[in-house]
Structure formats: structure tokens, C-alpha cells
Swiss-Prot record:
Protein known as: Epidermal growth factor-like protein 7
Disulphide connectivity of cysteines: 32-90, 57-63, 89-103, 108-118, 112-124, 126-135, 142-153, 149-162
Record's keyword terms, sorted: Angiogenesis, Calcium, Cell adhesion, Coiled coil, Developmental protein, Differentiation, Disulfide bond, EGF-like domain, Repeat, Secreted, Signal
Quaternary context: Interacts with ITGAV/ITGB3 in an RGD-dependent manner, increasing endothelial cell's motility.
Source lineage: Eukaryota, Metazoa, Chordata, Craniata, Vertebrata
GO biological process, one term: blood vessel development
GO annotations of cellular component type: collagen-containing extracellular matrix; extracellular region; extracellular space
Amino acid sequence: MWGSGELLVAWFLVLAADGTTEHVYRPSRRVCTVGISGGSISETFVQRVYQPYLTTCDGHRACSTYRTIYRTAYRRSPGVTPARPRYACCPGWKRTSGLPGACGAAICQPPCGNGGSCIRPGHCRCPVGWQGDTCQTDVDECSTGEASCPQRCVNTVGSYWCQGWEGQSPSADGTRCLSKEGPSPVAPNPTAGVDSMAREEVYRLQARVDVLEQKLQLVLAPLHSLASRSTEHGLQDPGSLLAHSFQQLDRIDSLSEQVSFLEEHLGSCSCKKDL
């Protein structure tokens, strides 16, 4: 006697031998009806056949004669076999290997690339580092912020790696920077030299203010006498000269404000503590 497991295996073997790769055997999930099959009935009958053969006649002569034999033959009956539906996997699905009659494998056209898997018709599940309808596009982890590099991030096809400072080496997976033997290098200070540059700018503006003040004294000294003499000698109104003097005053005032602003912020500069 066979056990239940052996009977089940035998039943699957019968189904696999009897069916085709296109059709399944009963309606179920992702299985569609593709047509109705039917046709004439084939039946057997006894057919009479006359078979010639040689024999000897009187006088030892060879004679030919016939004998009747009967054999089983097949013929089409006028009747029609009962119609029955035919089933196949619905569009976008195909037979699952090892499971007769099951349509559990999705179809993606074009197929998924770079290690992606087809999870439903026309939709791929992409591995880490790839994106797109068929997993054809590399993900730039450096620009999207997915990478966690503390220093420089370098994108590669399907992944990325971190480039460390001098004296550091990348980790096994390339996503971190590890210090080599010895003291860790100090990262460059981007604010180095800012204090000295600000001081030089203050000195330069102060020198310009001094020059403009000297010019202003030269202009204002003869201003009153110039106005009186111009009236006595019938000269034109010296308003243009006065307007020029006021412009010089405005320039001096503007430069003084710039010097004050730099001096005020120079004291609060964080990099000053490193000097």
C-alpha cells in the first residue's frame, strides 16, 4: 500500500505528464479561461481485411488465394464530445516551476536588471544602490544624502565609498574612514587666517580715512576767504566747490562707519581665540 505522500507525488507526476506548458488544469488565482475545447467522438470498430497469400494446388502447383482477417480500427463518430473550458495563466503571469497548475511567477518586460526581482507584472524590486522601472539607474548616495561619510563621499556604480583625510583608510565596506596607527590628523580649520585678513582691512581703511581728512582740511581752510573774495571780484557762486566738499565729507563718514563695523565684529570673531 502506498502512503498519502507517495500518492500525492504520483498525482503530480500524472498531471505534469498529461498537461502542456501553456495550460493549467482548474480555475484559481491568476488563472484565466482561454477557450472552450470540443470535437467529434472517436470510436473503435472491427474491420474486415482480405489478405492474399500463396499455397500449393493439385499437381504441386503454386496458387494464390485470399484469407479474411479481422482487426480493430478507429473512426470518427457523428456525435460531438461535451465542451469543456481551457485555462491558462492570466496576462503578466507564468507557471511556477515545480508547482503544476500554479501561476505564481510574475513577468516583467523588459526584465529586471542588476539583481532586481519581478514582484508583479511590470514592477521590479531593486536592490540597494539601484532604482528605475527595471533597476537600470544607479543611485547617487552622495547627492541624495543617503551616504554617511564624515569627509568626502565618492559615488560608484551601485554603491559609494568614503574618502578620508591623510592618515586614514576606508573601512571594509567603504562607508567609514578609520584612523591608521598613530595620532589622528587634525582636520584643516577653514577659518584660519580670517583674523589677520580682517586686521589688514581695518588698517587699509584707516589709512584712507586719514588721507581724506587731510584733503578736507586743505579744502575747508580757504573756504571762507574764497567766498568773500569771489563776491568782491564778481566771480561765479562757489556752490559747486562747496558741494564737492560735502561729497568728501560723505565719503569720510561712510569709511568711518565701515572701520567701526569691522572693529566691532573683530572682537567677537571665534577664530581670535586660536591666535
